[in-house]
Amino acid sequence: MKLSMPRFDQAPVLVVGDVMLDRYWHGGTSRISPEAPVPVVKVEQIEDRPGGAANVALNIAALGAPASLVGVTGDDEAADSLANSLQGAGVRALFQRIKHQPTIVKLRVMSRHQQLLRIDFEEPFATDALALAAEVDALLDGIKVLVLSDYGKGALRNHQVLIAAARARGIPVLADPKGKDFSIYRGASLITPNLSEFETIVGGCADEHELVSKGAQLMHDLELGALLVTRGEHGMTLLRPDHPAMHLPARAREVFDVTGAGDTVISTLAAAIAAGEELPHAVGLANLAAGIVVGKLGTAAISAPELRRAIQREEGSERGVLSLDQLLLAIDDARAHNEKIVFTNGCFDILHAGHVTYLEQARAQGDRLIVAINDDASVSRLKGPGRPINSVDRRMAVLAGLGAVDWVISFPEGTPENLLSQVRPDVLVKGGDYSIDQVVGADIVGAYGGTVKVLGLVENSSTTAIVEKIRKTDKAE
């Protein structure tokens, strides 16, 4: 399945559910307490992160999608911290604040990137999110997906009211379920239990065949549009009525912390579906996103550039020969990491030592080097009959194998102005005895503040000379 980056900026999502604050106390541990056989942690940093439904909304916003959140909190410092964090991330948050009851806080004591202790401050709320029914109703009119983020803490008590309101508007409903009664999610478009939550409802599954069979029955009984079971190191399984099961392997390279991984899955699904992606594609993106987030410590969100980079790895486009769409994504990601983009172009028909030296010098002008080459038809127009000696595919393959070259792309025109206008490199490099104003594309690059550099060529290194030498040798023989 080929993955691509959705237009998340056109994908508004509403999250309703259990809001909580994940608080971290970071410190050093060098001794055991004289009072009891426990480590002493000297707290050096206190960090607050949105958790639960707030983390789902944060993940959606981090992908670039408009995110709204409705939940229940106390009227306290923790709620203020949540509100400030969410506002800073661009999330529109509406809280029903309950006096004389604390906001749910999960406090984790950390030392040397290890969790030593977790302390929960919580009381189930008697008031649910529908205390803000008018606000929820108004928000539903401007969204494309509704997410129910259920942690069983009391903010979600009237699931069916929310599901019915969304379905009446044609809005898909995604639910991250909790508890022993999944009937409260009847009619949802998709639910995303982990394997343990799933088996709590349907019983143990000895193998994938049994998982698929029991999942199909659950979908039928609850009138679900689809079911996604997340299975940790075994990946995830998507079930849909009248479709074969879709099993996706886990994508994590390293696992540091699974905290919030389920939030990342449902948030990526929601944003992708809101952007118009088909469910299998959205699940593929969610699987990649989960692989990223478990490589981070604590409750974390993934950014759009991180997801783009994962897609590029998946499609083999982190380096090498790229299409224009792939190249533009790669450039966006590189710029998100403050990398300088260098561009050069040519025919590169027979690669020789002069080319290699020149490309190494070009690469030294920045962090990433794009080499754009004329396709076969344009080389023939420029160089005459019998050229190119090597086809465009072979020329690109050889260039892509050089350590100095990051990305290779071809263009059909005689000169690369059209490509330069789209790529907008930071530095345009040309080899030869030119003045800067003679370099093709210098005006384009200069207009947006880019730099043009002319590098000298290695003497006695010329493709034309090599071709002529070969021809003379052939005639002599």
UniProtKB/Swiss-Prot annotation:
Subunit architecture: Homodimer.
Enzyme class, spelled out: transferase
Function: Catalyzes the ADP transfer from ATP to D-glycero-beta-D-manno-heptose 1-phosphate, yielding ADP-D-glycero-beta-D-manno-heptose.
Biological pathway: Nucleotide-sugar biosynthesis; ADP-L-glycero-beta-D-manno-heptose biosynthesis; ADP-L-glycero-beta-D-manno-heptose from D-glycero-beta-D-manno-heptose 7-phosphate: step 1/4; Nucleotide-sugar biosynthesis; ADP-L-glycero-beta-D-manno-heptose biosynthesis; ADP-L-glycero-beta-D-manno-heptose from D-glycero-beta-D-manno-heptose 7-phosphate: step 3/4
PROSITE patterns xrefs: PFKB_KINASES_1 (PS00583)
Record-annotated active site: D263
Keywords: ATP-binding, Carbohydrate metabolism, Kinase, Multifunctional enzyme, Nucleotide-binding, Nucleotidyltransferase, Transferase
Name of the gene encoding the protein in the UniProt record: hldE
A molecular function (GO) term: heptose 7-phosphate kinase activity
Gene3D superfamilies associated with the record: 3.40.1190.20, HUPs
Protein name: Bifunctional protein HldE
Record's keyword annotation contains Kinase: yes
Catalytic activity: D-glycero-beta-D-manno-heptose 7-phosphate + ATP = D-glycero-beta-D-manno-heptose 1,7-bisphosphate + ADP + H(+); D-glycero-beta-D-manno-heptose 1-phosphate + ATP + H(+) = ADP-D-glycero-beta-D-manno-heptose + diphosphate
GO biological process: ADP-L-glycero-beta-D-manno-heptose biosynthetic process
Family: In the N-terminal section; belongs to the carbohydrate kinase PfkB family. In the C-terminal section; belongs to the cytidylyltransferase family.
Region span, Ribokinase: 1-318
